[in-house]
Amino acid sequence: MNRVHTITLAAALLASAVVTNPVLAETAAEAEEGQRLFREHCRHCHDKGSPNGKYTPMTLIQAQWERFFDRKYERKHRKVIDEKFGGVPVTEAISPEALEKIRTFSIDHAADTDQPMTCG
């Protein structure tokens, strides 16, 4: 088999594995949902020029995001009132399920990952 055919076959096999693998598809869907939730709940207070500081997933490394969500999130946000979501504290405006998706998105796309992201 010549080199072009080998490369074409390898690319086709890889593409079919990605398309037919439900785990990869679910991961992509979860990342998209995490990004949407980050934009919806976090960005309006943590965007460029914000007095709260600009934060995107690639602002911190994975260990810093883990430490933030494990130790600092509740303390830093429980008294912050979120006018966008009915004037309740941020910790009440974001459900535990949504927070977990935001956490996963932030950690999976931190500065020290293969796919660092902003929220564009």
What residues fall within each predicted segment?
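C-terminal capping alpha-helices of c-type cytochrome domains
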Residues: 87-120
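Short cysteine/histidine-rich zinc-coordinating motifs and their immediately flanking basic loops
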Residues: 53-60
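Bacterial N-terminal signal peptides that target proteins for export
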Residues: 1-9
